[in-house]
Each structure stands twice: as structure tokens, then as C-alpha cells.
Curated annotation (Swiss-Prot):
Subunit and partners: Interacts with GATA1. Component of the Mediator complex, which is composed of MED1, MED4, MED6, MED7, MED8, MED9, MED10, MED11, MED12, MED13, MED13L, MED14, MED15, MED16, MED17, MED18, MED19, MED20, MED21, MED22, MED23, MED24, MED25, MED26, MED27, MED29, MED30, MED31, CCNC, CDK8 and CDC2L6/CDK11. The MED12, MED13, CCNC and CDK8 subunits form a distinct module termed the CDK8 module. Mediator containing the CDK8 module is less active than Mediator lacking this module in supporting transcriptional activation.
GO biological process: positive regulation of DNA-templated transcription; positive regulation of transcription by RNA polymerase II; positive regulation of transcription elongation by RNA polymerase II; positive regulation of transcription initiation by RNA polymerase II; regulation of transcription by RNA polymerase II; RNA polymerase II preinitiation complex assembly; somatic stem cell population maintenance
Signal peptide annotation: none
Source species of the chain: Homo sapiens
Record-given protein name: Mediator of RNA polymerase II transcription subunit 14
Length: 1454
């Protein structure tokens, strides 16, 4: 940047200015007030300040002055403080005004500077031109007046121009510049050849030392090379014999490859000096070549000795340490080293042998190389080792020392071998020469890894021992003993022999389930025969049989120091009382020496002994030769011991199992050999009878059992397999493996490591499994006997997939895609049922998972497979429909927006009774009946007394009317009219006689299924005319007293996992907590997972149920249905029960007297408890009732996106009507009494409203509006208001806060409400406003994307002196892959001024402000352009203008 000019065009100097105080310590100090004067003085010599530095100075100055003011002003008066502040402000302002002017000027400062530079450059050029002209003119007038040119050199010019050369060049110049012509290549070769002949003649006639015999003559030179010392190149300067030799090049060949790092050992200056010295000798001496050799050879020997000395020092420093010492070193004479110094090693005291190596130069004959001497002299046992130790070819002191100690180590090993041969004349040790080692076999035959390796440490000369597997402490003791006295090796080898024998035994059985130890703690060790064995023994514990041991005793073999003999014993111990107490030895028995009698062979089905088997001797591997066996390690395998262990491990489990079977008095055939002696087995002759089954079933099961055999299998022989062979299987499954005449059942039992194999637990597990087989067999036997008479629908509905005596798997359904598995659980002593899906339905959830616990309890009470199939048949379709109901908790349904309510809670009460709780307020009881029907009633009424309500539930008004809309007219059950049920007409109806006759007749006898001959209580499978509930044993959830179809007799469910009683209702936990897996088809994949897009709430955790709401209707009067005689689903009294006259509401007030021989007149149920009377629906009707479907009677465009079932729509409408009644009491609305049931009437200042369920469908809540002044409203406006209430307010998802917001709108003044209705019309019919760019939606609750004025879900309409409401605008035109842009606009309408503006609400930090700013500007411009008139509302006009003119920037989203 150019220098900055201040006032009067002065540059600011870069270094001027003092320091101010108060600014940051790291910033440069600002200029003092007088900096401008100093800047003006230094402007010519300084380039000026950078603008950034100047700005920084000004800021620091202002900051420092402000800090001074903060320190000084508190001490001054108020007037002085104000004066100081004004002065500071004025001064600072003037300063920054100047800075501003300077910055504006600085924009053009660069251009001005460039122009100035160009002008200055042009001025300098003009000055140069003028000065040059002046000088040339002066030179012409003064210096060149008398100057003359020479005559032209015409001949030279002609030569150059014609010939291109300069032949007339003077000779003196030619000789000094142009070199002479070189000799030719032929002349050069001839000269060198002649010189080579002169050199050869000279060499022949001169005395040459023999060391210089390696020479080469070439190119007029002779090259002498002495390997390892030097290389010299010489020549002569003529053919005269007296001409001296010339030394051309000298190279020293001595190298230090170990410590030299590749660098030259002789400096170039030293070589130059030697070169001069040798050249002087060549000039003066009579024998120049001899003298040259002596001089160079002497220097190279001294250099080699020096190299060896440096290597020794490095060897001592880095590797050998004190193990090698320099005894003496004379430079150029000798080097003496000592190795294997025992005193240094600290192993002995006093005099110690010292081994020396001396390297010196022979003083008598200097021409010899370095001489090596050993003290004491090396033995002559191995000439190759001695010869290597006497040479030093590679100039390596370490190699020389290693060769020396290698020869001495070989001598020590020979001495040790002689000691071993004195102990054993047949010893078979060998010496390895690569690394000095003595290999001593300990136990013949011996592998290489089992031999004792004795090495000699080359550094110290000490013996080092190695034996695989031996601990280091023992090796250290052996080394110390042998190094002190080599004869001590003998007892150590004797001890190692027994140790190696133990290791061989351990290695032989390491793959077997055993634990080996040298000692064993026994409480009676001293008194038991085990104590008399030798000390060298091994205890082998059989891990699968922890009470048994194999003891191996090892003994010496006379006259065979390298062999052992083994004796084997079998020992049993008793279990210790405590873990830390020793066991007691019981039996000790020696194995036979010849074990051929222990090898079994099966022949003709009998166990016989054979003499043809191979003989296993005591010696595990006979000695084949006297040499140590090197190939392989099979000689270490003790096959006798391995055979003993394997035999005990195989046979003893069967012995234990046989003893347990005998103790339990279970007859068996004993241990038998199978498969040519390779396996064993135990066959049971009879299995004890089972408890809990009939004698007939036990006999049938015993007759069908052909064989029961126990075998051992598995890698560790810890798995028992009991094979059961059955014949005459009562059921044949569809599996191909179940089609043969006999069935094989395999029961597997794993033995724990802590338990002996073949113990009592195996037998107990087998008996439990046999009991499970018997229990299931009894049910299967009864089921098989009933199969010929099974109803056709059950035969088509189900099939037997698998029956393997342990489990019965049935597949059922139209596609056989569901499965049920039945098996007996011996731990819980009851049947266990599991459900699943197969085939194409695999992976889906079974619909009966909801009532799995109830099915299991029912089957355990009455284990009848036919009854179970009938229940599955009757409940599959209802449960499929029930599982489609939404069970996801939702937020914002009530005024407590943070509380989640579960839409539907499925509470199974029994296998055929399912209770549905809707939002913890209404309850629906569904009873699954036979013949494809269900009975539905209001579960809020008590099952025992219809005059009482279940705590926590409320009756659903109009439920009976709603359910009768789904009644199938073709159903056999006769029904009464809806009006007759809800509003009783005359005391007796047209079909009263049928009802009276049915009451006078005695109830039909419930005949149980007749037992077939030979069966035990089996039922026939023909379907009786009445329901199956009355033909089977009653479960605890069914009362024995007769009631309408036994529908009201369900008491609180039994079992620990049942749903809670209605008297203490809480939200039921999900089925997954009961061990039931709900698949996608249950609830989460239903259409109810998609909520209304205007609702901000998704799945959340459920909370507790809501409390009682004020004003809930109560019911009174006894329920006549509780005392009805036995009824069936086909009985018409299910819909119109006849109560006792004494309990009738009209009893005692009737003036008519009935004849004594006639039943009392029929009293229709009161409407308050009419819904407690069950309504019979077919399965298809129930599916329609519970299946999500569009709202009937509504145009698809008007209906919301929340798809729900008719039952949810009805209950939701009832809840909304209940909320509306409570809201009317809280808001400023006037309630109007109405005689119509289920109708709510109220009025506002301008409207009368009537709210009731739709009479056609009972699934929507409809509003009928009547204005007080008919002239103020148009019919289409009222229709829009009514349709908006039906579709947007009281429709799904049925939120109470939408009602609160709508009632606030109804209470608004007429002109405001009319504008809101126009906005509602734009929402309901968006296609009618094609000229608008946006669609509008009236937000009755605050959406989550709205400005944070209140929690989401709260009412979005506030009506006081000003009106606040929210609109959601959605852009019409959008690219298909992208979602349409939507914005939330909070609008506030001022009733006093009549202006419509956007509410000024703080936005979230991460939200965009572009869209709200544009909306606010459009609304402000509309207010300016269209000022409101008195009594006119501008809401709709402003909103319509906003929808027409709002355009977001491209790519921008709110």
C-alpha cells in the first residue's frame, strides 16, 4: 500500500510516535499527539505508514483514552465528568473523521503515485539526452579537431572477403595463440609399446623381492600389488638403465571392514608423505624396489596391528566386556590379549588359568606377515581348528578369538565325554563342531529334543546346559555344579532320567482328558500302600472321572543306565468333605503287565478275549540301534499308558451310569460292546412309569417303545445320547422323515465339567424327558382318536406338520402359514406353547401372540388339541383385525400436550375375550364365538352388575347404535331394531311369544362329547349346536352360572402375566414384555403409523391414564342381563334380554296385571346400559369395523390424511363430543338444554350451534349452525364452517385443543369470523383459487415449526383485544423430487385499528429470516395501500394478498 498522507500532504513516518498506555500489551504503541509534526519532518526520508497500522494506532489511542477516563471520572463531579466525556467524544470523532477522509483519498493514491513515477522517469530520460548531446558537441569542438583516420587495409579486407581467412596474421601472435599439432594415435601406441619393453627389460635385470611377484605391465607402467597391504604404480622416463624409477601412484590396501565404517585408514597427506619418502629411496638406493617394499611393508604391518588393537577396544566396549583384556600393546611391534580369565569371571579364587593370544611382527624377518602365538598352546586333536586359529586373513580380531576359543571348547568337550564314557561304556553322546556342543542321550531311545545339550560359552569358556522343558533354576544349578567339577554330571543325568520319564508320560496323555502331577495330597498316605511305592511316580487324574487316578511308578533297569521300567496302578479316592481338605485313597490295584487280555473283541454277539491281538510290552518303544534316534519324536510316546487312560476314560462312564441305573432300580442289560469293539452301550429293559398320566396311556407308550439305548459321543466323551425307537406312531406329520414304520428319537445330555460323566443328573434329565414325552403322548393319543370325527372346517384349517414325541407342531390358517408348537416343560411342570410363522409368512408375526399366555393357560387346564384348534379357528380372523389397530402412543391429544396417550391398548382377558381400551377412557369387550361371529359390548360396564362401571372407564354413548350398523342381516341370530334397544317402546313386542317360549322351555342339556370305547375322556369332534365354551371344562375366566352366551361371565384373568383387572386399569404393557414378539403386521406397519401432517407428534412413550373428567355421565339401575338363563349366540335374547320383573325399572308402576301362567312382560333394556348387551358381528363385519378406511360420506379431498378405522372414528367422535361439553362450560359459550340424546347445543353472540354424531354413519361429529340474524350470513359460508368443523376440527386425530381453538373462533365477532371462514374455504377448496401462488391451512394448534411462542400442540387461536392465529402456507409450484415449501405465518389482528400484521415473535437461531421479512413487508405494504374502514375486517384481504404476492428467492427455503 502507498504511504498514507495526513494533513498538508505529509506522509506518516513508520517509526515515529511514542507509546500510549491502556491498550493491549502486544499491540504497537499508538503515536503521541505530536506525531504529525514528527511525521512532517521525516517525510522525505521515510516511505510512510501502512494504512492498517495507522488504523490500529488510532484504535489503541481511543481505547487508552477511554481506559484513562474510566479510572479518573469516578473521582470528579458530575459536571466535570460530562465535560470530559464530551471532549473525549469530540476529539475522537474529529480523529476518525480525518481517518475517513484519508481512507477515501487512499483509494486513488495508487494511481497518483504511478503517474508521478512515470513523470519522474520521463524527466530523467530527457536530462540524459540533453547531457549526451552536450558532451558530444563538446568532444567534436575540442578533442577531435586534429584527429585523423589511418589508411584503409585493403589487402587484408580482400583476403577476408574472398578467402574467408586471415593469412597475413603476424607469426608472433600465431605461435602464442595456436597450439602445436598433437601426435597421432599410432605414434602414441608405438611409444607405449616401446616403453613397455623397456620396463620389462628393467624388471628382468633388477633384483625383485618375492613379495612383489604380483605385477602387471601395461600402458607404459608397472603395477606391484601385495594383497592386504599396498599397490604401487611405477614407470621410467627413458631407456637408459641409470634412469631412476618414478612412483606414479600409491594405494594402501589395509581395510577395517568391522570398525572402519568404509572410510580410508590413511589420510591423503600421509600418503603424499609416504609417496615422497618412497620416491626419494628410489632415487638414492642401489636396490630401489627392495627398499620400496621394505618401507611400505613395515608401514602396512604397523597399520594392521593398529587396526586389530582398535577392533579389540571396540569389542571390549560393545560385546565382550571384561571377557577379553588387552595384556600388552606396543605400537608397531605386538598385541597380547587374554581370554577365559576365570578370576575376572568370579567363579574361582586364587590362581586361575589364563588363555592368551599374541599377535606380533617378526623382528628377525620383517618381510613375514603378522605372527600369532597361543598360550597355552592349542591341542593337536583337530588340525582344521588349529589351522584356522593360526591365521588372520580377514583382519578381524573377533574371528581370530572365536577360532581360538572354538578349538579350546572342543578340547573341553572331549574331556567331558571321557568322563561319561567312564560311567557308561555304551554311552552314545556326540560332539557337534559347528557350535561346540556335546549331545548326551538321557533315556534311550532318545530324540534330539530329549537329549541334554552341553555347550561351551565361547566368551567365558563355561559349560552351558540346555534341555527342552526343564526349568531354568534346575539348569542353573546343573551349570554351577558341572563348571565346578565336571564329574558331577553323572548324578544329574541319573536325576534327569526320571524327570524325562515323567515328561514322556505327560506328553503321551496330553491329548487325553487328564491332569498330571508328581504329588498328591492324601489323608492316609502313610498308611496306604501308595506310600510304599518309589519316590519317582506320577499321578494322573481322569478329569471326566475325578474320583479315579492312574499311578505310574518308574524304576531303574539294572546294568542299563539309560533305561527305565514302568509299573501302572489304578487308584480310587473318595470325595473330600471340603475343598481344602485332602482326599482319602481307597483302592490301589496294579494293571496286568500283559494287557492283551484287556483288549476286547466282539464275536457272535458275545464279549470274548482274544490271543491274536498285538502285545503291548512294558517298553513303550524298543531300542532299535545304539545311535540316538533323531528322526521324529515317536519314541517319546508311551502307548501303554495312553491305552490305559483311554480304556478307563471310555469304560468308567458306562460303569458309573450302570451303577446309577441300578441304584434307581431301572432294569438294564449292562455295558455292551458295539461296532467290533469300538463303542459301548447300555440298553434299558423298562422305563419307570410316569406320574400324572393315565395307566392306559402308560401301557400304550410302553407297547410302542421298541428300544432305549445310552451311548457316549462327542469329542470329549461328555455327551450322552439316549436313542428311543418307537413303533405305531399315533400321528404322521407332513415331514418325509416321519413316514416310516418306526421313529427314532435322540435325547442329548451334556455333562458339566464339574460333574462326573454318567452321574445321577443324566438319569434324572432322561426321566424328565421321558415324562415330557409321556405327557405329550397322552394329548396326541387323544387327538389321534378324535381325528376321524374332526369337523371339516378344522380339518381344512389345520394340519400336523411335525410330531417327534417331544414336540407337536401344527400349521393352521388358510395358507397354513401360522404354526403352533406344543411341548411339556419339565422345569415348570406344564405345557409350553410357542407360536410362529412358516412358508411365505415366515418373518411375520403370528396374530395369536397377543393371547399366547391365555392359550397356554387354557391348554394346561384342559389339554385338548381339538379345543385348542377350535379356539385358534375362532380367534384368528378377529385377532388379525384387532392387530391392525394403532397402538402407538401419541402426544397432543388433550390439553396436556406433553402427555402421551396410547390410541388402542389390547388387553387379552382370556383366550376368547379381548378387551380394547381407547385412550384409557373407553373400553370395548370382544368375545370370539364359534360359527364365524364375535360378540361386542361396552367394557365400561361391570361384567357382574350392569349398574356399576369399571373404574377408570366411561361408557361410550351410542355404541349399540353404531355397532348395529355393521350387523349382517343374513346372520342367523335374530335382532331387534336399534331404536327399540336404545329407546324402549311398548311393554311387549311382536316377537315376544318366541322369547317367552324360549324362557319357559328348560335350557338344553349341554351334552359332552361321548367317550369312545377304549379312550380316556376324549371328546367327539362334531360341532354341537351351541358354542364350544359350554362343552369343555370351564376355565377360571368363565363362570359356571349361565349368562347370555357366557359372554358376561369373564372374571378377572388368572395367571401372573394376565392383563390387569378393569377395576384397577392401567395401560397394559406391550406384548413384548410378556415374551410375545409383535411383527410388522401387528401395529407398526398399519396405516395408523402415519399421522395427520398437521400433528407434530409421532411415537412417544406412553404416560399414565388421564384422570376422571368432570361431568361424566353415570349409570344406575341393575343390569337385567346378569340374571339371564343360559343363552347361545343364536338366541335373540342376546340383543333383547328380558329381565326379571322385580328388577325392571317399571316394576311396581305398571297398572296391568299379567296372568300367573304367563311370563312377565318383556322390558327392553334401558339406553344407559344398552351397550352392555353384546352385539353379534361376523368376522367380515369386524374386519370392516377395525380396518383403516376412508371416512364415509366425505369427499376424498376434504378428508384428512390420517386414515383410521370406523371404530376409532366413532370413539374419537365420542371423545370430541365429551371434550366439547367440558369446553363449553369453561369458555364464554352458553349451553342450551336439549332433549335429544347425544346432541350438544350452545350459542354464541351471533350463532346457534348443534353438535351431534352423523346419523348415517355415527363416525363423524357434525355441526349445524343457525345464525341469529339470517341476513349477516350466506348459506355457503355456514356450510364451509360446518364442513370445516367436521373434517378439520372434530376429525382424526381427534385432538382436544383443536376444539378449544375452534370455539374461540366461534366466539369472535361476526366480521372477524366471516373472514376466517373465507380462509377456511380456501383450505377446503384450494382448486377454486387458481390465481394464488400458495395454499393455506388454518392451524388450530401450534405446529412445531412455528415461532417459539408456546409449546407445540397448544391452541393456536388467542382472542382478546387483539386476535392471534397461525396459518401454514404451502407453495403450489414445486419440482417433483422436492417437497413443497411450507412456512408458518403468525398473524395478529388489531380489533381497534383493524390492521393485519405478522406477529413479531423471536425466531430460533438456526431458522431463516428471509421468508418472515418478506411476509411482514407484504402485510405492511397492504396495510399502507388499503387503510381499514370502520367495521370492516382486513384479515382475509391481507391473507389473500399475501398468498398472491409472496415469492421466495430461488433455491431459498424458510
Amino acid at each position: 500500500m502507498a504511504p498514507v498522507q495526513l494533513e498538508n500532504h505529509q506522509l506518516v513516518p513508520p517509526g515515529g510516535g511514542g507509546g500510549g498506555s491502556g491498550g493491549p500489551p502486544s499491540a504497537p504503541a499508538p503515536p503521541p499527539p505530536g506525531a504529525a509534526v514528527a511525521a512532517a519532518a521525516a517525510a522525505a526520508a521515510s516511505p510512510g505508514y501502512r494504512l492498517s497500522t495507522l488504523i490500529e494506532f488510532l484504535l489503541h489511542r481511543a481505547y487508552s483514552e477511554l481506559m484513562v477516563l474510566t479510572d479518573l471520572l469516578p473521582r470528579k463531579s458530575d459536571v466535570e465528568r460530562k465535560i470530559e466525556i464530551v471532549q473525549f467524544a469530540s476529539r475522537t470523532r474529529q480523529l476518525f473523521v480525518r481517518l475517513l477522509a484519508l481512507v477515501k483519498w487512499a483509494n486513488n493514491a495508487g494511481k497518483v503515485e504511478k503517474c508521478a513515477m512515470i513523470s519522474s522517469f520521463l524527466d530523467q530520460q530527457a536530462i540524459l539526452f540533453v547531457d549526451t548531446a552536450d558532451r558530444l558537441a563538446s568532444l567534436a569542438r575540442d578533442a577531435l579537431v586534429h584527429a585523423r583516420l589511418p589508411s584503409f587495409a585493403i589487402p587484408y579486407a580482400i583476403d577476408v572477403l574472398t578467402t574467408g581467412s586471415y593469412p597475413r596474421l603476424p607469426t608472433c601472435i600465431r605461435d602464442k595463440i595456436i597450439p602445436p599439432d598433437p601426435i597421432t594415435k599410432i605414434e602414441k601406441q608405438a611409444t607405449l609399446h616401446q616403453l613397455n619393453q623397456i620396463l620389462r627389460h628393467r624388471l628382468v635385470t633388477t633384483d625383485l623381492p618375492p613379495q612383489l611377484a604380483n605385477l602387471t605391465v601395461a600402458n607404459g607402467r608397472v603395477k606391484f600389488r601385495v594383497e592386504g597391504e599396498f599397490e604401487a604404480t611405477l614407470t621410467v622416463m627413458g631407456d637408459d638403465p641409470d634412469v631412476p624409477w618414478r612412483l606414479l601412484k600409491l594405494e594402501i590396501l589395509v581395510e577395517d571392514k568391522e570398525t572402519g565404517d568404509g572410510r580410508a585408514l590413511v589420510h591423503s597427506m600421509q600418503i603424499s608423505f609416504i609417496h615422497q619418502l618412497v620416491q626419494s629411496r628410489l632415487f638414492a638406493d642401489e636396490k630401489p624396489l627392495q627398499d620400496m617394499y621394505n618401507c611400505l611393508h613395515s608401514f602396512c604391518l604397523s597399520l594392521q596391528l593398529e587396526v586389530l588393537h582398535s577392533q579389540t577396544l571396540m569389542l571390549i566396549r560393545e560385546r565382550w566386556g571384561d571377557l577379553v583384556q588387552v595384556e600388552r600393546y606396543h605400537a608397531g611391534k605386538c598385541l597380547s590379549l587374554s581370554v577365559w580369565n576365570q578370576q575376572v569371571l568370579g567363579r574361582k579364587t586364587g590362581t586361575a588359568s589364563v588363555h592368551k593370544v599374541t599377535i606380533k611382527i617378526d623382528e628377525n624377518d620383517v618381510s613375514k606377515p603378522l605372527q600369532i602365538f597361543h598360550d597355552p598352546p592349542l591341542p593337536a586333536s583337530d588340525s582344521k581348528l588349529v589351522e584356522r586359529a593360526m591365521k588372520i586373513d580377514h583382519l578381524s580380531i573377533e574371528k581370530l578369538l572365536i577360532d581360538s576359543v572354538h578349538a579350546r571348547a572342543h578340547q573341553k568337550l572331549q574331556e567331558l565325554k571321557a568322563i561319561l564314557r567312564g560311567f557308561n561304556a555304551n554311552e552314545n553322546s556326540s560332539i557337534e563342531t559347528a557350535l561346540p556342543a556335546l549331545v548326551v542321550p538321557i533315556l534311550e531311545p532318545c530324540g534330539n529334543s530329549e537329549c541334554l545339550h552341553i555347550f561351551v560359552d565361547l566368551h567365558s569358556g563355561m559349560f552351558q546346559l540346555m534341555l527342552y522343558g526343564l526349568d531354568q533354576a534346575t539348569l542353573d544349578d546343573m551349570e554351577k555344579s558341572v563348571n565346578d567339577d565336571m564329574k558331577r554330571i553323572i548324578p544329574w543325568i541319573q536325576q534327569l532320567k526320571f524327570w524325562l520319564g515323567q515328561q514322556r508320560c505327560k506328553q503321551s496323555i496330553k491329548h487325553l482328558p487328564t491332569i498330571s502331577s508328581e504329588t498328591l495330597q492324601l489323608s492316609n498316605y502313610s498308611t496306604h500302600p501308595i506310600g510304599n511305592l518309589s519316590k519317582n511316580k506320577l499321578f494322573i487324574k481322569l478329569t471326566r472321572l475325578p474320583q479315579y487316578y492312574i499311578v505310574v511308578e518308574m524304576l531303574e533297569v539294572p546294568n542299563k543306565p539309560t533305561q527305565l521300567s514302568y509299573k501302572y496302578y489304578f487308584m480310587s479316592v473318595n470325595a473330600a468333605d471340603r475343598e481344602d481338605s485332602p482326599a482319602m485313597a481307597l483302592l490301589l490295584q496294579q494293571f496286568k503287565e500283559n494287557i492283551q487280555d484287556l483288549v476286547f473283541r466282539t464275536k457272535t454277539g458275545k464279549q470274548t478275549r482274544t490271543n491274536a491281538k498285538r502285545k503291548l510290552s512294558d517298553d513303550p518303544c524298543p531300542v532299535e540301534s545304539k545311535k540316538t534316534k533323531r528322526a521324529g519324536e515317536m519314541c517319546a510316546f508311551n502307548k501303554v499308558l495312553a491305552h490305559f487312560v483311554a480304556m478307563c476314560d471310555t469304560n468308567m462312564p458306562f460303569v458309573g451310569l450302570r451303577l446309577e441305573l441300578s441304584n434307581l432300580e431301572i432294569p438294564h442289560q449292562g455295558v455292551q460292546v458295539e461296532g467290533d469293539g469300538f463303542s459301548h452301550a447300555i440298553r434299558l429293559l423298562k422305563i419307570p412309569p410316569c406320574k400324572g398320566i393315565t395307566e392306559e396311556t402308560q401301557k400304550a407308550l410302553d407297547r410302542s417303545l421298541l428300544d432305549c439305548t445310552f451311548r457316549l459321543q462327542g469329542r470329549n466323551n461328555r455327551t450322552w445320547v439316549a436313542e428311543l425307537v418307537f413303533a405305531n406312531c399315533p400321528l404322521n406329520g407332513t415331514s418325509t422323515r416321519e413316514q416310516g414304520p418306526s421313529r427314532h428319537v435322540y435325547l442329548t445330555y451334556e455333562n458339566l465339567l464339574s460333574e462326573p460323566v454318567g452321574g445321577r443328573k443324566v438319569v434324572e434329565m432322561f426321566l424328565n424327558d421321558w415324562n415330557s414325552i409321556a405327557r405329550l403322548y397322552e394329548c396326541v393319543l387323544e387327538f389321534a382318536r378324535s381325528l376321524p370325527d374332526i369337523p371339516a372346517h378344522l380339518n381344512i384349517f389345520s394340519e400336523v406338520r411335525v410330531y417327534n414325541y417331544r414336540k407337536l407342531i401344527l400349521c393352521y390358517g388358510t395358507t397354513k402359514g401360522s404354526s403352533i408348537s406344543i411341548q411339556w416343560n419339565s422345569i415348570h411342570q406344564k405345557f409350553h406353547i410357542s407360536l410362529g410363522t412358516v412358508g411365505p409368512n415366515s418373518g411375520c408375526s403370528n396374530c395369536h401372540n397377543t393371547i399366547l399366555h391365555q392359550l397356554q393357560e387354557m391348554f394346561n387346564k384342559t389339554p385338548n388339541v381339538v379345543q385348542l384348534l377350535q379356539v385358534l379357528f375362532d380367534t384368528q380372523a378377529p385377532l388379525n383385525a384387532i392387530n391392525k389397530l394403532p397402538t402407538v402412543p401419541m402426544l397432543g391429544l388433550t390439553q396436556r400436550t406433553n402427555t402421551a396417550y396410547q390410541c388402542f391398548s389390547i388387553l387379552p382377558q382370556s383366550s376368547t375375550h379381548i378387551r380394547l381400551a381407547f385412550r384409557n377412557m373407553y373400553c370395548i369387550d370382544i368375545y370370539c364365538r364359534s360359527r364365524g361371529v364375535v360378540a361386542i359390548r361396552d367394557g365400561a360396564y361391570s361384567l357382574f352388575d350392569n349398574s356399576k362401571l369399571v373404574e377408570g372407564f366411561y361408557p361410550a354413548p351410542g355404541l349399540k347404535t353404531f355397532l348395529n350398523m355393521f350387523v349382517d342381516s343374513n346372520q342367523d341370530a335374530r335382532r331387534r331394531s336399534v331404536n327399540e334397544d336404545d329407546n324402549p317402546p311398548s311393554p311387549i313386542g311382536g316377537d315376544m311369544m318366541d322369547s317367552l317360549i324360549s324362557q319357559l322351555q328348560p335350557p338344553p342339556q349341554q351334552q359332552p362329547f361321548p367317550k369312545q370305547p377304549g379312550t380316556s375322556g376324549a371328546y367327539p369332534l362334531t360341532s354341537p349346536p351351541t358354542s364350544y365354551h359350554s362343552t369343555v371344562n370351564q376355565s377360571p375366566s368363565m363362570m359356571h352360572t349361565q349368562s347370555p352366551g357366557n359372554l358376561h361371565a369373564a372374571s378377572s384373568p388368572s395367571g401372573a402375566l394376565r392383563a390387569p383387572s378393569p377395576a384397577s386399569f392401567v395401560p397394559t404393557p406391550p406384548p413384548s414384555s410378556h415374551g410375545i414378539s409383535i411383527g410388522p403386521g401387528a401395529s407398526f406397519a398399519s396405516p395408523h403409523g402415519t399421522l395427520d401432517p398437521s400433528s407434530p407428534y409421532t411415537m412417544v412413550s406412553p404416560s399414565g391414564r388421564a384422570g376422571n373428567w368432570p361431568g361424566s355421565p353415570q349409570v344406575s339401575g341393575p343390569s337385567p342381563a346378569a340374571r339371564m338363563p343360559g343363552m347361545s349366540p343364536a338366541n335373540p335374547s342376546l340383543h333383547s334380554p328380558v329381565p326379571d320383573a322385580s328388577h325392571s325399572p317399571r316394576a311396581g308402576t305398571s297398572s296391568q296385571t299379567m296372568p300367573t301362567n304367563m311370563p312377565p312382560p318383556r322390558k327392553l333394556p334401558q339406553r344407559s346400559w344398552a351397550a352392555s348387551i353384546p352385539t353379534i358381528l361376523t368376522h367380515s363385519a369386524l374386519n370392516i369395523l377395525l380396518l383403516p378406511s376412508p371416512t364415509p360420506g366425505l369427499v376424498p379431498g376434504l378428508a384428512g390424511s390420517y386414515l383410521c378405522s370406523p371404530l376409532e372414528r366413532f370413539l374419537g367422535s365420542v371423545i370430541m363430543r365429551r371434550h366439547l361439553q367440558r369446553i363449553i362450560q369453561q369458555e364464554t359459550l352458553q349451553l342450551i338444554n336439549s332433549n335429544e340424546p347425544g346432541v350438544i347445543m350452545f350459542k354464541t353472540d351471533a350463532l346457534k350451534c348443534r353438535v351431534a354424531l352423523s346419523p348415517k354413519t355415527n363416525q363423524t361429529l357434525q355441526l349445524k349452525v343457525t345464525p341469529e340474524n339470517a341476513g349477516q350470513w350466506k348459506p355457503d359460508e355456514l356450510q364451509v364452517l360446518e364442513k370445516f368443523f367436521e373434517t378439520r376440527v372434530a376429525g382424526p386425530p381427534f385432538k382436544a385443543n383443536t376444539l378449544i381453538a375452534f370455539t374461540k373462533l366461534l366466539g369472535a365477532p361476526t366480521h372477524i369470523l366471516r373472514d376466517c371462514v373465507h380462509i377456511m374455504k380456501l383450505e377446503l377448496f384450494p382448486d377454486q383459487a387458481t390465481q394464488l401462488k400458495w395454499n393455506v391451512q388454518f392451524c388450530l394448534t401450534i405446529p412445531p415449526s412455528a415461532p417459539p411462542i408456546a409449546p407445540p400442540g397448544t391452541p393456536a387461536v388467542v382472542l382478546k383485544s387483539k386476535m392471534l392465529f397461525f396459518l401454514q402456507l404451502t407453495q403450489k409450484t414445486s419440482v417433483p423430487p422436492q417437497e413443497p415449501v411450507s412456512i408458518i405465518v403468525p398473524i395478529i389482528y388489531d380489533m381497534a385499528s383493524g390492521t393485519t400484521q405478522q406477529a413479531d415473535i423471536p425466531r430460533q437461531q438456526n431458522s431463516s429470516v428471509a421468508a418472515p421479512m418478506m411476509v411482514s413487508n407484504i402485510l405492511k405494504r397492504f396495510a399502507e395501500m388499503n387503510p381499514p374502514r370502520q367495521g370492516e375486517c382486513t384479515i382475509f384481504a391481507a391473507v389473500r394478498d399475501l398468498m398472491a404476492n409472496l415469492t421466495l428467492p430461488p433455491g431459498g427455503r424458510p
